[in-house]
Amino acid sequence: MSQFMIRYQIINLSKVFNSPKSLNFIKRYTTSTASTTTTTTNDDSNWISTPNITVCGIGGGGCNSVNNMINKELYGIDFVVANTDAQALAISCSRKMVQLGKTLTRGLGAGAVPEVGKKATEESIEELMNQIGDTQMLFVTAGMGGGTGTGGAAVIASAAKAKGILTVGIVTKPFHFEGKHRMKLAEQGLIELEKSVDSLIVIPNEKLMEQSQELYIGNAFQMVDDVLYNSIRGISDILVKPGLINLDFADVRSIMCNSGKALMGVGEGEGKGRDAIAANIALNNPLLENINISGAKGVLLNIAGSDLKLQEVDHIVSLVSSKVDPSANIIFGSTFDQQLEGKIRVTLIVTGMDQLIQQQQQQQKQTKIESQVEQKLHSTTIVDQELKPIEPQKSIIIEEEQEEQQQPKPIIPGIFVEQELLTTTTTANITPSQQKQESLTQNNIFSPPQQQQQQPSINLQPNYQQLYQQLYQQQQQQLQQQQPISFLKRLSNLFFTNGNNNKPYNNNKNTPGSNYE
């Protein structure tokens, strides 16, 4: 009876202490074998065979996410925070904290310079690794784009991986409104972090806005912290939390060790068909960045609920298996969560996506370029269609000019009209026999067309062509200068001027300076 009461007290106390080490400490001093266990080694594996999992938050974003996890009582996790800003560490909820770069930054922060954050982390890396301790799995969380998190996350990850710790990076990319410079720093930091971790999960903050576009700025950052919380919880629960189906740490290590970039999706469903709803939401989650996961090589699946049925678990696993490579390594676990109250939550971690992500990004760039080219072509066709109605006006003007050319030119005193010149030249050259033959052919309407003589073509003389061309050029120049001059005045200036002194002709014999003198 006494042993039963002791175990009942242990179960109640386990709800207060969230880490396995604290639970083992209680068991060591409350069981009947306490006298013997106090003299044994400090190896806790004899009591609870659960892996030690640690979350390290670095920088302002990482410290905020750790505070959110502690406030939500994430089960079975140790927390460590590190920052160059002493004021941010003072309000942290974590018991383990490290001030980075005490001599370099003096607790004043990195000033959004990743190089300063990197050097500050290298200065305090030994103290930080002592706080992390002998853990089997380390989550490095940070908000990329600043100074401390962007520069120091890769330093912590490389030091942990060198000790044989399974290192997973879960970081965020900034919103668009935070600026292009911050986004550029984040992308550079992601390149360095990817080289230092076993698996990297990147959460783009901009994708979260697609779920709800009417968010206040404070709620938006809270939603980012909740996504980080759910991603770590989806992995840690199947290792340390009791449930229907628990996984070994070796299974998780086989999926996430040296797996490169990974993607995450979370979905919840309730009511009829809740299993299919939760699975489809997780598979079509915006955090998957619209990337086809059919070529994924590893899948980690966590199914949580308060009243799960075996048939629902089987249906969810079959739906996820149909979307990935048939040869993919799929491991799944099922845990109890009384807070869901009739809901099912599916957490999906897809690994081995490096090549698929690169191919998808190249295709997206290519489609973006093609769409830009199509838009330019569409805009040019619209401009052409707007300019096409001008062409009939041009043709009308040309037809009017041709009609004016066909009409007889006005007779101006002092010069010969081209028609008179042409008629005199043609009649002078035709003999009387040719005139008689021409009249016969014109009167004979039944004569074949081959025997009919063609009318002589009327061609302007070169002198008149030059004059008309000069008139046209002067007219265009004067229209541009907006100085209208009458047509007759221009003709008089051209035809009635003296070639020597450019004076007008004087036809009056009695006046001095006339051309008849």
From Swiss-Prot:
InterPro entries tied to this protein: Cell_div_FtsZ, Cell_div_FtsZ_CS, FtsZ/CetZ, FtsZ_C, Tub_FtsZ_C, Tubulin/FtsZ-like_C, Tubulin/FtsZ_2-layer-sand-dom, Tubulin/FtsZ_GTPase_sf
Organism listed in the record: Dictyostelium discoideum
NCBIfam families the record matches: ftsZ
Main location: mitochondrion
Function statement: Probably involved in mitochondrion division process. When overexpressed, induces mitochondrial tubule formation. Binds to and hydrolyzes GTP.
The protein's name in its UniProt record: Mitochondrial division protein fszA
One GO term (biological process): mitochondrion organization
Record bears the keyword Heme: no
Single GO term (MF): GTPase activity
Family: Belongs to the FtsZ family.
